[in-house]
Design a protein with these regions (language model features):
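Multi-pass alpha-helical transmembrane bundle typical of ion/small-solute transporters
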Residues: 1-197
Length: 197
């Protein structure tokens, strides 16, 4: 989930900061990840998913895993490697659903989110291309652009982590103790470092 969606979420940020050292970008994005999940862990008594897994059908962590639950992340890695867009939420969370209504709920939320994002993106794109492209295509970037870009990209990343941490946390106990939290946070943080390197 992290490998697939992080590139979609912060890909333009990474592309426009290719001149920066990889470790600086990793520490920035990884630091935001750590702050975001630590906040959830403190606020929600060990839950790193911002309580997104408290709905019926996902409220208990699995005591054993089925083939589909283990294979889902492997399929996701293969699809990501093939550069195919995929809904990580639907692919991962639906394999843990305990009832058909849970799958329907996940599918409904995913589809409504996609339609909303498509509509909003289309409106913004039309406004930007018609209004701003002619005005700003020939101008030089302001010195304020980079800090504003880092702020907005960091905010987008934090919100993505708040929404999609459930895709990873679905494999974990719903309330992590300190050792489990450090292991989870460290594993993802190091994984982000490998991804950025």
């Amino acid at each position: 989930a992290i490998a697939n969606d992080s590139i979609q979420t912060i890909g333009t940020f990474l592309a426009s900061n290719q001149d920066k050292p990889w470790w600086l970008l990793w520490l920035f994005i990884g630091g935001i990840f750590l702050i975001t999940i630590t906040t959830s862990w403190f606020l929600f008594d060990g839950d790193v998913s911002y309580q997104r897994l408290t709905s019926k059908g996902f409220d208990e962590s699995p005591s054993s895993f089925t083939f589909l639950q283990v294979a889902a992340p492997l399929f996701l890695l293969i699809l990501t490697r093939l550069r195919m867009p995929v809904s990580t939420t639907f692919l991962l969370l639906s394999s843990f659903a305990t009832s058909a209504s849970s799958i329907t709920g996940v599918l409904g939320k995913s589809l409504s989110g996609y339609f909303l994002a498509f509509g909003a993106g289309l409106v913004v794109w039309l406004l930007v291309t018609k209004t701003f492209e002619k005005r700003f295509s020939e101008t030089k970037a302001s010195k304020f652009w980079t800090p504003i870009q880092w702020l907005t990209s960091g905010s987008l990343w934090a919100v993505w982590v708040m929404q999609d941490a459930a895709n990873v946390a679905v494999y974990l106990p719903r309330s992590l103790n300190v050792l489990q939290f450090v292991g989870f946070a460290g594993f993802i943080f190091i994984g982000l470092g490998i991804l950025f390197y």
